[in-house]
Amino acid sequence: MLTFVLIHGAWHDGSCWDEVAAHLRNGGHVVHAPTIAGNGRNADRRVDHAVCTKSIVDFFVSQELGGVVLVGHSYGGTIIAKVAEAEPQRLRRLVFFNAFVLNDSQCLFDETPQNVDHTERGARASGDDTFLPPFDMVRDVFFNTVSREDALRFYGNWTPQPIQPFRDKLDLKKFFTLDVPKSYLHATEDIRVPMPER
């Protein structure tokens, strides 16, 4: 039996893992899927990357977790790297599932330069420095393998994403010295996060 902590990507909350979590629990595993600070309905969206990371570190501490397989998807990859720096002794393995793996001193926007302008425009227009892309902008990128009906259902669970965590440059020097085992999963039909040439 393993203990999994599943960390969602942008615009989501922990409920996006419900089906995966149920499958893992049916296999006898313990599964947690916390929501990153600033995400989810009714969240305080005035957060930066450090606050987001702290929310997951605090979850680990409050739940007294250890021996964890920590999985991060997309933006969640930037969170699990910093959680690993803070609590490496609690981890059995890190899994980057179609996730951003930043270099030291990078921010998420450095890996998605094509998205910066329209995201920043949306954040300025929002009044609270968040961005929720319109459905038609994301249909063929995030929901490219499902029916329109399912795509609309999935999109209906999205909430505005705080953008400051995308801007924050991360000090990852410690991360690259950790001896925590790491796995990198790349789903080939996920076209949102291309496989880096490194």
Map each language-model feature to its residues.
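Helix-loop "lid/cap" segments that line or gate small-molecule binding pockets
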Residues: 136-145
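Short beta-strand immediately N-terminal to the catalytic nucleophile in serine-hydrolase-like folds
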Residues: 70-72, 97
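The conserved SAM/SAH-binding core of class I Rossmann-like methyltransferase domains
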Residues: 34, 97, 185
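Conserved serine/cysteine hydrolase catalytic core
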Residues: 160-198
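Conserved HGGG/HGGXW glycine-rich cap/lid loop of the alpha/beta-hydrolase fold
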Residues: 2-41, 61
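Flexible "cap/lid" loop of the alpha/beta hydrolase fold
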Residues: 85, 90-135, 162-166, 170-171, ...
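Gly/Ala-rich beta-loop-alpha elbow adjacent to hydrolase catalytic centers
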Residues: 72, 76, 80
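Active-site loop/oxyanion-hole signature of alpha/beta-hydrolase fold enzymes
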Residues: 30-69, 82-86, 109-114
